[in-house]
């Protein structure tokens, strides 16, 4: 648990801990008992405690009106952050109710003030404006008891007394400073006028503005740009969106804005109407387009100016405004939305929230009340799966992971509270019938809203996601009491229980404000939009004149202030700015003017929204952006309503930048082994874990991959670009690829099929009735046909038609259509319950009976000769278009008369009465009537109740007093000191009583106080008196006990107990006792109360040579020292004569007994070791004979010096002298040589040193020379002439012994990523690459099936989509239809292709003919290469075949009719055998890898794709497209072996180093292996001194100059090895023969055993019968003896080196046998080849049947011919040539092949003899 920290407000310490706020929960209620409630259900004092200012329609009361009470059970505190002028003086009687006009006039306090601490979120009055004082009723001068009198305009009174500290001038605060609340320190700056728009006062007269504001008092709104979450584009923030006071009604939920402009300076507030068009006319036309997921707000923050103005760069709490519950709530302007993509918010599992609550309360003392606000701890909460509860803070926070549309509110993790006009899980469905109530979701949220709590809603981005234009948004809802405010600091996503590093949500690039953020965003739900002619003109920003018809250049964005990315063709300004352009111009480019959110007719001109253009004076037509050239590079453009989207072709997908299409092979999830080397026909050196081909081949690590050993493609080839589109060193993660899909909504899945057309999409069905729609081919909208948005049925869908509409000739006033449009008029049926176009066929037709269902909607249709008229039902009115009936908003007439909140409903309304009123219903009329609270019992207990309008007040009786809550409270007379001076005062309602005190008490000031008896002398003698309430108690001293009445102490007779003095005589005394006459071995203790044992061991001299053990009354000597033993009596230790013991010995000396030990007297030159052995004296341990330039080595009776480099031995080898290197030759080329002690110096520049190889001055690698001390735990990086220290290995890496950071291969766990994907290790992490049809799970550790039916919109058109494992099927609902995959819809059976009568009978198609399929590779003769056998013509010619059949008929070309007949579904698709449904053949993707087998991709692995396949070459191979196969890649041409010799092999290479260079970790560089042992701690772990002579078990004559391994020492001139003098095996022993590998070869050669040519012989596993360790436990190794040559065999191995060979003919009666001979494996070893013996690698029996190559981190093996490397065991295993070369018949014709160790033998059949050439047997001649 992290320590609790205390947040501090400016200038005062937090005095009350945050734990005091524990009672907070999701639905806490403040304790009742207050006199009355304010209009939103909160309690407030009665009468004149506060004047209530009201908002129209039940808005929040003014901040000055609401008295909010805390949870601390103290006197309640007023709202924090209010100016003193806002706290009205109390008065008697009822408050004056504002008139209707006044109630409708929003006050300044209503507009700008919130219940929050002043230093945090208070909004001040703008510069130059005065806050209107609340209207108060005149109150009598009589003040109320306990209520402070406050001046209306007086500033905060400074504390009394003289101030000290900072900013103090003359005992008072300096100008510009004031004291902070509850402190006496002048640390609070003053800004007059105050900072506006929630700006904070940083220093005197210096405001720090929030984002989006500027000015000296933050009064100016910055014309910045905000990302529109709904339309997924950056749009200019208009006046209605910038206002900090913007509110949206939560009851209506239809997008209506209710806000007021700021009042003019010095003028009272006046009612304002919202500007026209502030919300899009179709912003909520269909909820399915309001996608929820990624969203982002991008704001530009200005820098500080010269006017002492500061600007905050902090990210604002969210794209919308803070939301509080109550009757009116502020919600974000738009619903958070995302492109058509996966809803990433659903995958959020664990979220962290960092917030700070603020608590305000009022404390009153001595008639003075003070307001105190304190900030709680900055608290971090975690939410698992959407719910979180922190027991420390008492908060319960939930996250809304679902979208609540149409004004709905999230009340749980997966639950929305919907308004009256919508229903569904997301509030996305309209109410089916106007008179039907919403589904039962009202009870719980309604009770929630009426609770005396506040709900704060914050919409914030997840702060630890990667920065992008569309970060995930999370809505955080917090319910809390009104006196608390919450500030959210951070919302971060936590993965896997570990808190990841945070990433700032910043966007450095600025896209154009009206360009779609990404492909896939659709701005409108219909291709046609009407202009709203019934609304006032909407003010638009001034735009440059647009000359019609003038063509110019259209630019998409700007780069460094210059227009960039122009389109390929010239366009008009309207076409450019209305579609994808951001700038336009002919000679000079200018920004495009902003577009309206919906069609608006202004000054007779039609302004169309983004993505639409004018069709005529009243219609806007969708712009087909896909006609613009170059819009979707390497992708297909799909036009949408008001926008477009780019989709990649099959087999491709968008890369993470969403700017280009890459092959889906780049995120293949298939895993396999990655091989670092290739041998002849096989892969070698595989990595330990399976990885993807991308990781293997794109990272330069592997040469081949997969079970088929597929060679990695060469860089620059098409195959390389497919899997590595980003080049070497980069791969794509599947999580980086966003599929251009979205989940279908519930109503879309249940929607009936609709016809498909040529265009992208049509209108969606209406909410009232579901009926098929037609796809719009050329759509437009008419002005004046959209119903009012107040209608609950409006704003859902705009039905589109495919032709021009007929005009209503009734009351609709619209211009006629052109004649050419009228000529095409046809009858059209349209659902009237949605936003429709009223269409007619021809005049004279009865429209009311033309088949449409209730044309007028909620009304009666009256047919007229030239049209029709609608007579609306009660509660409805005629729409301004005169075409149908819409809901009448009765609330505009205030039917509730200011006594309640009016909620308009479809065809009716409802009054929600304020507290103090009750609802009275009379027919269709509702009104609020006053409640007579005085009729309720106990309302004014102790007083008289007087009812008032909407409230009541109490007149208190005698003995009672009016409290601030409006109740009569009994006066406690007992509080006065003079009441009952000689007794106890008992208060009673309205009076009191005096009672006499009990015993032990006395009267004092009306109370009975305890008498302290302990003050009386003599009480509790021999004890301690403890006063009790009304009595006392005695606690006795030791030796005394309490009397029975506990009022005294008496002596205890300790001698009465046998436990006292058990070993002596007991004598009782007063309060104690004494012991005497103790037994033998005991003595009396110091206090005389016991006979204690006498510890003899404490006396000196007892057991001097042993351990004295004390016993009861005695002691004994035990555990005698070495050389001593206990005496017979056990009371002493006596000496032992060790020289008498035959087991004791003094090896090499004379034994002499001593007291407690013995001595070994050694001869001269030896010294005693271990007390028993005389060893040679090590002179090197004494004086430094060879120091300081040599190392002293002891010898038998002497020593010699091993001189350091640069010194030579002198004086008979007993000293070292310096060698002057500069005297011989100048070793410093390009520098000056200076001889030094033991060396020389080349004078070079700082940071450089002479190279030991060239003598030139080269850079000093400080990191290598000095190692870890240079940078400690950090990583050292060398630089020319210097070095730098950087942080060590990053997470996901571990440090290798050489200091390199090596990636941790998480994919070592085979279960990672499951069975439908494979793990792809990346640098520092890993990713799961899933198979086709699968996607990565939310955990990221496995692959799950992709439900294409949910993610792909209308993938099967009108057919039913059925998801299957890894794919999906399209099924028609009717058995009489079949799905046409080419056209994408269901059609009647037999409509195309073969008719039903022609279809074959039965359920299966006839079996096709199968023959051989031939490839057409270059360099091969036609029909010479069989690609596959037993294939059909479709399987051959529709895939990779060139010809087919016995006649080798050529396959038709792809553009021929014959090819279309054989392959109707195209190349890569073949008919499904047996799938014959109603006469139609089903086609599927051809799996070429299965059809043609391994022959399709030799030296590689075949991977099937849809359609086609790819060859994943083995490591060391690359794909040759011309030959269609994997060919060997010559790594030696890529400089794969640095400082060594590279030898290319089939599929791999070998790097050989010249001594003393060895291979490094990469296996591609030779480096110096003679580094210091400090750099290589385990490099020479098996290197030590080699001793040439061993005498008397003493090693002598060490091998001078270097150290060796155990095998090197014993097999050359040594007899013992290492400091432990490990003896070598005898040279005549079998162990020596095995160790040095010499005698065995000679013995076997003498026995006539011949060895295979080209191979060096080494012992096998069966030959090692001796212990694998030497005598001292050190390992010994095989040693390869000198190479030898013997006569060549009769049949040489074809893989060996060619030479003249003479056949050896055996007896004709016996089968010939090939017997290999021992020859040199490399007649001429290549230069740089490290021909090391196995033991030189410092390994144990390693690399048998091969050479050991020692590298820095260990060793590797180069196997002899006939053997191959088993990388798992690092051993060379035999190659079975008889099975490896396609069977023994190839090797031994007319005989049989027998495999041998490292070779093989051919046994010829009778009548055949061995042939000298190929390994065959020929007939005898």
Curated annotation (Swiss-Prot):
Keywords of this entry: Disease variant, Disulfide bond, Dwarfism, EGF-like domain, Extracellular matrix, Glaucoma, Glycoprotein, Growth factor binding, Heparin-binding, Hydroxylation, Phosphoprotein, Repeat, Secreted, Signal
Residues of the signal peptide: 1-35
The TB domain, residue ranges: 552-604, 672-724, 1411-1463, 1584-1636
Predominant location: secreted
Phosphoserine sites (modified residues): 506
Region Heparin-binding, residue ranges: 94-115, 232-249
Positions glycosylated per UniProt: 181, 343, 421, 616, 811, 1170, 1309, 1430, 1568
C-terminal domain: region residues: 1639-1821
Glycoprotein recorded as keyword: yes
Keyword Cell membrane: no
Any single GO BP term: transforming growth factor beta receptor signaling pathway
Disease: Glaucoma 3, primary congenital, D: An autosomal recessive form of primary congenital glaucoma (PCG). PCG is characterized by marked increase of intraocular pressure at birth or early childhood, large ocular globes (buphthalmos) and corneal edema. It results from developmental defects of the trabecular meshwork and anterior chamber angle of the eye that prevent adequate drainage of aqueous humor.
Protein name: Latent-transforming growth factor beta-binding protein 2
């Amino acid at each position: 648990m992290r320590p609790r920290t205390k947040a501090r407000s400016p200038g005062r310490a937090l005095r009350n801990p945050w734990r005091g706020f524990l009672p907070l929960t999701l639905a806490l209620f403040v304790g009742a008992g207050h006199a009355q409630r304010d209009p939103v259900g909160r309690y407030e004092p009665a009468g004149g405690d506060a004047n209530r200012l009201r908002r129209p329609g039940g808005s929040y009361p003014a901040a000055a009106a609401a008295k909010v009470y805390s949870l601390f059970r103290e006197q309640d505190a007023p709202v924090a952050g209010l100016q003193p002028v806002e706290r009205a003086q109390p008065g008697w009687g009822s408050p004056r109710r504002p008139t209707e006009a006044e109630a409708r006039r929003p006050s300044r306090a209503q507009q700008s003030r919130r219940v929050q601490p002043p230093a945090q979120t208070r909004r001040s009055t703008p510069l130059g404006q005065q806050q209107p004082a609340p209207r108060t009723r005149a109150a009598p001068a009589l003040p109320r008891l306990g209520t402070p009198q406050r001046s209306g305009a007086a500033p905060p009174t400074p504390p009394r007394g003289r101030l000290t500290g900072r900013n103090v001038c003359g005992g008072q605060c300096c100008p510009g400073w004031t004291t902070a609340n509850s402190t006496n320190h002048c640390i609070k700056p003053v800004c007059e006028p105050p900072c506006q728009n929630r700006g904070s006062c940083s220093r005197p007269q210096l405001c720090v503005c929030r984002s989006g504001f500027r000015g000296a008092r933050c009064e100016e709104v910055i014309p910045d740009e905000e990302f529109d979450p709904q339309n997924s584009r950056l749009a200019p923030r208009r006046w209605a969106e910038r206002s900090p006071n913007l509110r949206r009604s939560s009851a209506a939920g239809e997008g209506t804005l209710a806000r007021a402009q700021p009042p003019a300076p010095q003028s009272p507030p006046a009612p304002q109407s919202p500007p026209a068009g502030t919300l899009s006319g179709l912003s909520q036309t269909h909820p399915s387009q309001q996608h929820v997921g990624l969203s982002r707000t991008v704001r530009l923050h200005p820098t500080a100016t010269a006017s002492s103005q500061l600007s905050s760069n902090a990210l604002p709490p969210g794209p919308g405004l803070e939301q509080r519950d109550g009757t009116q709530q502020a919600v974000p302007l738009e619903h958070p939305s995302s492109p058509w993509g996966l809803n990433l918010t659903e995958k959020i599992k664990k979220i962290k929230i960092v917030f700070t609550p603020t608590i305000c309360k009022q404390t009153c003392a001595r008639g003075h009340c003070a307001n105190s606000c304190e900030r709680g701890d900055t608290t971090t909460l975690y939410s698992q799966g959407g719910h979180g509860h922190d027991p420390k803070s008492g908060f319960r926070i939930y996250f809304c992971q679902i979208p609540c549309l149409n004004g709905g509110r999230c009340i749980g993790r997966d639950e929305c509270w919907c308004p009256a006009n919508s229903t569904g899980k997301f509030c996305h469905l309209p109410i089916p019938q106007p008179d039907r109530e919403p589904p039962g979701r009202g009870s719980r949220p309604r009770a929630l809203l009426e609770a005396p709590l506040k709900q704060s809603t914050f919409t914030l981005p997840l702060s630890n996601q990667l920065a992008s234009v569309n970060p995930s948004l999370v809505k955080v809802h917090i319910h809390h009491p009104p006196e608390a405010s919450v500030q959210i600091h951070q919302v971060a996503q936590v993965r896997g229980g570990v808190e990841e590093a945070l990433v700032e949500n910043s966007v450095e690039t600025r896209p154009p404000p009206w360009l779609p953020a990404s492909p896939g965003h659709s701005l409108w739900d219909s291709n046609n939009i009407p202009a709203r002619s019934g609304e006032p003109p909407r003010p638009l920003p001034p735009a440059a004149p647009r000359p019609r018809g003038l063509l110019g250049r259209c630019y998409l964005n700007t780069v460094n202030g210059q227009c960039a990315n122009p389109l390929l063709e010239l366009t008009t300004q309207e076409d450019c700015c209305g579609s994808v352009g951001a700038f336009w111009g002919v000679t000079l480019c200018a920004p495009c003017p902003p577009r309206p959110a919906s069609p608006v007719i202004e000054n007779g001109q039609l302004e169309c929204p983004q993505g639409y253009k004018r069709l005529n004076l009243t219609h806007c037509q969708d712009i087909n952006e896909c006609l613009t050239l170059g819009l979707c590079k390497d992708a297909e453009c799909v036009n949408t309503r008001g926008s477009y989207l780019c989709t990649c072709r099959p087999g491709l997908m968008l890369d993470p930048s969403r700017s280009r299409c890459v092959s889906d092979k780049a995120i293949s999830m298939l895993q396999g082994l990655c091989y670092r080397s290739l041998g002849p026909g096989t892969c070698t050196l595989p990595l330990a874990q399976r990885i993807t081909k991308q990781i293997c081949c794109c990272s330069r690590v592997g040469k081949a991959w997969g079970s088929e050993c597929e060679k990695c493609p060469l860089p620059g080839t098409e195959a390389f670009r497919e899997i590595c589109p980003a080049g070497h060193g980069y791969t794509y993660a599947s999580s980086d690829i966003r599929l251009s899909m979205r989940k279908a909504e519930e109503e879309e899945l249940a929607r009936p099929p609709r016809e498909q057309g040529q265009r992208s999409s049509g209108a969606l069905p209406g909410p009232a009735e579901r009926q098929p729609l037609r796809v719009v081919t050329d759509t437009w909208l008419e002005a004046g046909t959209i119903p009012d948005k107040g209608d609950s049925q409006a704003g859902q869908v705009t039905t589109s038609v495919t032709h021009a509409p007929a005009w209503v000739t009734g009351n609709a006033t619209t211009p006629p259509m052109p004649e050419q449009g009228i000529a095409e008029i046809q009858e059209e049926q349209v659902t009237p319950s949605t936003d429709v176009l009223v269409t007619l066929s021809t005049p004279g037709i009865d429209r009311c009976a033309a088949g449409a269902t209730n044309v007028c909607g909620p009304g009666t249709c009256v047919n007229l000769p030239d049209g029709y008229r609608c007579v609306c039902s009660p509660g409805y009115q005629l729409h301004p278009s005169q075409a149908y009936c819409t809901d009448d908003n009765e609330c505009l007439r205030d039917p509730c008369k200011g006594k309640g909140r009016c909620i308009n409903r479809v065809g009716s309304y409802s009054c929600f009465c304020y507290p103090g009123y009750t609802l009275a219903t009379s027919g269709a009329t509702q009104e609020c009537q006053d409640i007579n609270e005085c009729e309720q019992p106990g309302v004014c207990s102790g007083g008289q109740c007087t009812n008032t309008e909407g409230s009541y007040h109490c007149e208190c009786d005698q003995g009672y007093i009016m409290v601030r809550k409006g109740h009569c409270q009994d006066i406690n007379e007992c509080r006065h000191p003079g009441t009952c001076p000689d007794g106890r005062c008992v208060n009673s309602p309205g009076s009191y009583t005096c009672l006499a005190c009990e015993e032990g008490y006395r009267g004092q000031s009306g109370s009975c106080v305890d008498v302290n008896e302990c003050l009386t002398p003599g009480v509790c003698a021999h004890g301690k008196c403890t006063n009790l309430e009304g009595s006392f108690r005695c606690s006795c001293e030791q030796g005394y006990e309490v009397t029975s009445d506990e009022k005294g102490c008496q002596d205890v007779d300790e001698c009465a107990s046998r436990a006292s003095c058990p070993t002596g005589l007991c004598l009782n005394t007063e309060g104690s006792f004494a012991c005497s006459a103790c037994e033998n071995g005991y003595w009396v203790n110091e206090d005389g109360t016991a006979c204690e044992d006498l510890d003899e061991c404490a006396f000196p001299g007892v057991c001097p040579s042993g351990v004295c053990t004390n016993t009861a009354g005695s002691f004994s000597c035990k555990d005698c020292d070495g050389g001593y033993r206990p005496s017979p009596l056990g009371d002493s230790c006596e000496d032992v004569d060790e020289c008498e013991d035959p087991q004791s010995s003094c090896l090499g000396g004379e034994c002499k007994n001593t007291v407690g030990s013995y001595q070994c007297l050694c001869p001269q030159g030896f010294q005693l070791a271990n007390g028993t052995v005389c060893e040679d004296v090590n002179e090197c341990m004494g004086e430094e004979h060879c120091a300081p330039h040599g190392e002293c080595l002891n010898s038998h009776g002497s020593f010699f010096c091993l001189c350091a480099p640069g010194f030579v031995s002198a004086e008979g080898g007993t000293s070292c002298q310096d060698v002057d290197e500069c005297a011989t030759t100048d070793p410093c080329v390009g520098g000056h040589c200076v001889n030094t002690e033991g060396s020389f110096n080349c004078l070079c520049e700082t940071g450089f040193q002479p190279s030991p190889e060239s003598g030139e001055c080269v850079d000093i690698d400080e990191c290598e020379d000095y190692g870890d001390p240079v940078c400690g735990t950090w990583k050292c990086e060398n630089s020319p002439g210097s070095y730098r220290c950087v942080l060590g290995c990053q997470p996901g890496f571990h440090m290798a012994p050489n200091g390199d950071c090596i990636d941790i291969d998480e994919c070592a766990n085979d279960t990672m990523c499951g069975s439908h994907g494979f793990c792809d290790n990346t640098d520092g992490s890993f990713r799961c690459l899933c198979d086709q049809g699968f996607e990565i799970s939310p955990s990221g550790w496995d692959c799950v099936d992709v439900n294409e039916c949910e993610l792909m919109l209308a993938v099967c058109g009108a057919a039913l989509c059925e998801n299957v494992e890894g794919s999906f099927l399209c099924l028609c609902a009717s058995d009489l239809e079949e799905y046409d995959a080419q056209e994408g819809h269901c059609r009647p059976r037999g409509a195309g292709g073969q008719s039903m009568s022609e279809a074959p009978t039965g359920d299966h198609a006839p079996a096709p003919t199968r023959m051989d399929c031939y490839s057409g590779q270059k360099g091969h003769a036609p029909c010479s290469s069989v690609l596959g056998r037993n294939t059909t013509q479709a399987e051959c010619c529709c895939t990779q075949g060139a010809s087919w059949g016995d006649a080798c008929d050529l396959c038709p070309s792809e553009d021929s009719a014959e090819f279309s007949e054989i392959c109707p579904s195209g190349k890569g698709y073949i008919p499904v055998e047996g799938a014959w449904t109603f006469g139609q053949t089903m086609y599927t993707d051809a799996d070429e890898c299965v059809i043609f087998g391994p022959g399709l991709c030799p030296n590689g692995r075949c991977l099937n794709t849809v359609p086609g396949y790819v060859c994943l070459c083995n490591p060391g191979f690359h794909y040759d497209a011309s030959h269609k196969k994997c060919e060997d890649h010559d790594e030696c041409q890529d400089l794969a072996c640095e400082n060594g010799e590279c030898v290319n092999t089939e599929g791999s290479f070998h790097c050989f180093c010249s001594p003393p260079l060895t291979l490094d970790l990469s296996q591609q560089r030779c480096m110096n292996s003679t580094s210091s042992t400090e750099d290589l701690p385990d490099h020479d772990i098996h290197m030590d001194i080699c001793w040439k002579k061993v005498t008397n078990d003493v090693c002598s004559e060490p091998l001078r100059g270097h150290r060796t391994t155990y095998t090197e020492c014993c097999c050359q001139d040594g007899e013992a090895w290492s400091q432990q003098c490990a003896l070598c095996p005898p040279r005549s022993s079998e162990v020596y023969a095995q160790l040095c590998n010499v005698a065995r070869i000679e013995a076997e050669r003498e026995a006539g055993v011949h060895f295979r040519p080209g191979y060096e012989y080494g012992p096998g596993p069966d030959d090692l019968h001796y212990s694998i360790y030497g005598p001292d436990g050190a390992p010994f190794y095989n040693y390869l003896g000198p190479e030898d040559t013997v006569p060549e065999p009769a049949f040489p191995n074809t893989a060996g080196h060619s030479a003249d060979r003479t056949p050896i003919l055996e007896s004709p009666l016996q089968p010939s046998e090939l017997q290999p001979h021992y020859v040199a494996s490399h007649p001429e070893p290549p230069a740089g080849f490290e021909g090391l013996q196995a033991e030189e690698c410092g390994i144990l029996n390693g690399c048998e049947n091969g050479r050991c190559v020692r590298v820095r981190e260990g060793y590797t093996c180069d196997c002899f011919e006939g053997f191959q490397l088993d990388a798992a065991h690092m051993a060379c295993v035999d190659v079975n040539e008889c099975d490896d070369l396609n069977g023994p018949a190839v090797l031994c014709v007319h005989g049989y092949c027998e495999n041998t160790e490292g070779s093989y033998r051919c046994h010829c059949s009778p009548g055949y003899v061995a042939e000298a050439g190929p390994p065959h047997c020929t007939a005898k001649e």
